[in-house]
Structures are given as C-alpha cells and as structure tokens.
C-alpha cells in the first residue's frame, strides 16, 4: 500500500471522520496478518508492538473515535488515541528524566497542576508584585492572574519561548489595549508581565509542578528536539491518524511533520468551517500547511440546511441591501423581555414534543453565551414538563452542591482553629444533610432533622469558637423534648461520629482525605442511591482533595515551614467556597447509553460536541455575542499565531476576524440542523440593553412563530 499521506478536507458533516476510519481499516488490512506482525514486532529491544498514534480534538471525540477504530478492525491492531494536549502531557511525564537532566532540575516526580491550583499558587507568588506595580481592584485580581497565565499557555502552544512573551506583547498590542485589559498603569507593562511569567515558570519547575503552559514549553523546547526522544517515537509508533487538525496547536504541526519526514503512513482531516478552538490554543492556518505534503481528498458533501440556505443566511447578515426573506425552515420567536423569551422558548419545545412534531433528543438549544439564569430556567421548565435536558459540559461550582458544603463544614469541626469557617447556618445545613436516612413513597431521601429543627439545634447546641467549635449535647436546648425522637437520635449519631473522628485525628494526625472518605461512607451511606450529579460532585471533591494535598506535600518538601496543617485545610475550604472548582470529574458514563433529552449548550460547547439535530433553537439570536469570541477567545491570542508573527493586532483586524468567525459559526450550525431553525429574540437582553446584533436581520426576515 502507498505510504503517501492523505489529507481529507471538507465541510461540517461531510464524512471526514468516516473516511479516516475507512483509511485506517484499509491500512490495517494491507499489513501482514495482525497476530503474526505483532509477534514479529516483539523483541528484546522493543517488548511492545509499534502502535498507531491517533489524535482527536477533545476528550469526547477521542473516546468516540477510539471506539470506531477498534470496531473497524475488531481490535486486531493496537492504537493509542489521545488529544494533542493529553499526548504532550503524558510524554513530558514519561520522559521527565530527559527534561530534568537537560535543565539541571531536582530529580523528583512531576506533579500536574490543575488550573484552579495554578491560579491559587500564582496569585500567592505574585502578590507582592501585584501590590507594588499593578493598580488592580480586588475584583479584577483573579482575571488578571488568569490572563497572565493564559499568555504562557498561548506562547507554549505556538512554540514561543517564555522569554519572548514580553516582546510579543509590546509588538502585537497597543499600550492602550494592554492598560485597558490588564488594568495596568505602568509604562513598562510588557516587561513586568514577562517577569511575572518567568518567575512563575522557574518557581514551578524547581518544585516539579507542571501547568498546561509549562507542559507545552517543555515539550517543544526541550523534549521534542532531544534525539533520544525522537528515536523512542520511531520505535513506538508506525503511523499517525489525526482527526480535526484545525483544532490543534501550532507545535502539533511540528510533531506531525516529524512523522511525515520519516515516511509514517499518515491521514489527516481538516474542516475549513471548523476552527472551533481558534482564539484558544489552536492555529489552524499553520496546520493547513501539512496539506502541501499530502494527497488531497476533497469531500464536497454539504449536509443539513447549509446545503440550500447558507448563502441566503450569510447574505442577509453581511449585505445591508439584501432584501430577501428566509424560507419556511426558519421561524422567529420574539418577545420584549428576556424572561418572557425563556418561558416562550420552553413552551414551544414542550408543545412540539407533546404534539409529536419532534422528539426531545432531536432538539438543541444553542446560545452565544449561556448564563446560569437561562440554563436554570430552561432546565426547570422542561424537566417540570417531563422533558429531560442534557446540558453540555455543565460546570456548576462544587460549592453549589449541599453535600459538598456539609462535608466542608464537617472538616471545620474535626480540625482545630477552623471555627470561623463554620457559621451557624452551615451547621444547620450539615445536620439536615447527614440525617437523610428515610425514604418517602416517591423514593426521595427524607432527613430525620428537617431545616426548622436543624436551625433550632444550631442556635442552642452549637458552641461557636474560632479555635474549637463543638456540637453540645441535645439537652442543652431547653425544649429538646419538642424536637422528636428521630431528630434527637440523628443528632446524637452525628455528634458521636464527629467527636470520635476528632479524637482519632488528634491521636493519629489523620489526613483530611481520610476524614472525607469516612464521612462519605458512614454519614452519607457511601453515596448509595444518590443522583448522578451528587455522585459526580463527591467524586470531584475527592479528586480535588487528593490533588490539593499532593501539591501541598510537594511544597512542604521545598519549604518545610510552608504553613500549618490548619492553614492548609482553611485554604482548601476557601478555595472551594470561591466557586472556582466545578463538578466535572473523569467521565463514568461513556459506556452508558444517554437517555433521550434536549441538548442545551453555548455555541462553543455545541460545535465541540460535533452532533446534529432536526430542530435548533438559537437563543438570544440578536445578541452581539454571536459575532464575538467571548469566553472562547483568550486575551492576546492572535499575536501568537504562527502565520502572523509580529503583526500588530488592530481594531480593524479584530472586526475582520469576528466576521470570519461568525460566518464559520453559521455555516457550521446550519450543517448540523436538518429541518428547522427557531430564531429566539428578545428586544431587551439580560442587562436591559437593546439587542441589535447582526443576526437581527435574520429575525426580521423569518416568519414569526405562531
């Protein structure tokens, strides 16, 4: 079989992934019998067979693609399926000895930092400089730290040394933009930002801590150029299949080029209408250069409403003189207020499903920016009508779950000097949560201590003390006999557990992770019969706690007098209470068939989901957020694109990029809907301002919903 690499290019839902799977099947069939080839590949120098390296744009796509490839060849050939960042992370950790040898670092196993931990440690490290040089309101400090850390990630993904970030900022952005976005009033803004980044990177490497930005830089700058590592790549893999390369970082192109240089059989797919992660860490135009080294396989199939109506839609939003009307497949749903729009949208979905026009799983509600009010309102109304909703990548703060709040309050009672983190209202909530032991006729957990009784107990039986808060005996409450036997028994059981655990902790210095695990097993009945969202929150809490104390242990190795254990627990509790950690643990549902439900998400989430539906509801259709990147665009991302280095990013360039993004978004969404688009418009937005975005012309050109 020819080893000429293949470049599969086509629009949304044109069959690119299917074609990639087909090429993989043909390649495997063309190889010697898989069992024989696997045995021949085994030797003393290479104990494992060379596998195929497969890339996918995100974790959801990765799992689906891995399943398709395995089914295509009935598991007869080994594959390694990763996202680009996942692969780089694994490689940096696997070949860490090569890195610390070249950098002269301490020989210690690296620890990957989660974004929230990275934020916390960087804020602490930069606090003196922020106070001295940067005039920031406290409310903007979080955003400032996040944006500076994102600069390191953008630079690493594009192959720019951290030392050059200040230069890129100075050349690529105006002083006005820097001051406006970063809220800095110093003349040497880029230099000071660069100093913060270098300080953070060096501090992290000394302690073996790896953030995403540091991982990117370590890979392209130190690991990938190492000839010993390159030899290992050649020994481990014999081909590469990369799906949706328009969502890959620039340094991925260098890796893929390396495989092409060594005549690896390679297949790539590229979507000109995609570029979903452009503005984050992706550099699709740079990746497209790989096409010049490949045999081009164009796919011209256009799916959904895009086949007939994409040009009409684009003409309406771009040409002010275009006076056409939209066909019957487009319907406008208009109200005055946003609240009314949410109710009317939910009602329209309920009516359509109840009347049998469309099934719930055939509907997607897509918004440019889905705020919590809209998410909650739509989910409450639809689920109340018996229509399930599947929110895409829902990331509610962990602290929004009452079980998590109760467990954090429990830590404040077991460990000393944490009384300020256990107010009376938190104690009352904890008593309610830990007394859920009865079931009603509808199989709902009923607490033995209801909120009223819990409030009375917290008022009379809780001893507030900053150093040693305690739950007193139930008879401390003069009218304890009015509480009832069930409430008193449940309260005494909780008190007995807390006092026993406190005694064990004082004797054996128990880790908070052990205390949390014991509380989940004994006070929450090991999570038995809890709904999935609560189980996910508990799993994420334990994963977060494990990660937090691993990092704490590493910091204590470098700084023995780092801080007291109570201060560490206090920081952990406050970190979660700030709401920066969400319930998004490693997925457990990938083998469970999802129930029929309405899909709900923002534009970025829906496009990344790479699905399609019969009906689309485009929420807030006239919002200006449709033509803006919003949260899917990081600050200063364009100045790190490989195709436009050292070009100043101007307002005109930003407007041009916004228009190009809007056209890609509309073409992409229209290809993902097959029957009807309901354009949901309210005259007033969330903030009460008029909604006059570019898609208003679509609303005006469509027939109104009856």
Language model regions located:
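Conserved helicase NTPase motor core
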Residues: 182-291, 298-305, 313, 337-338, ...
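Accessory C-terminal helicase-associated subdomains
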Residues: 190-191, 468-602
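Helicase P-loop NTPase motor core
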Residues: 12-32, 303-385
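ATPase/helicase motor core of nucleic-acid motors
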Residues: 357-362, 367-499
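Conserved P-loop NTPase-based nucleic-acid remodeling module centered on helicase motor cores
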Residues: 48-160, 164
